[in-house]
């Protein structure tokens, strides 16, 4: 709550005075935009109004909050699921296993929803903004957490710590960063490739960097 809500309120308070200096089409439906921000429903607001992340025809001041909306949906719903599993599991290892399996299943469903959906629609805005189709990177993070550990370091991280020297560790991190840079410059939101493989590659690159950073933390 304290990490998300106060910055969102501050963002709206700081942004609104500047609306006096921009074109009126930016503030059209501003009430709905603000409601979407505070309700963490900006992604659905953009879908209902026909918005596009790169659109110059329907500019919205808070369009970037679509990703925060997806994040909050994940935190609330997945948090409840993990809480329920924690009450049913008999050990931490059993809980980790159940979280891993459910995260994998949710990742597969979400990814293929975007993959198949992007082949069936004329405008990709719906699959781009939808929580169902764009939540799979968070489940990759859940999978990674069960593999590398959160409070306690897993055996996998310890193994990488033993087998990787500092140079190899940094190279793995740099490889993930390079993939993200290449995707940034060469893949646009209008490309079908972005929805079929681009976002997946970006997510895998980010996971690789997180893993490398975790191993590097153990080394230092």
Feature locations, PLM:
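Hydrophobic membrane-embedded alpha-helices
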Residues: 2-220
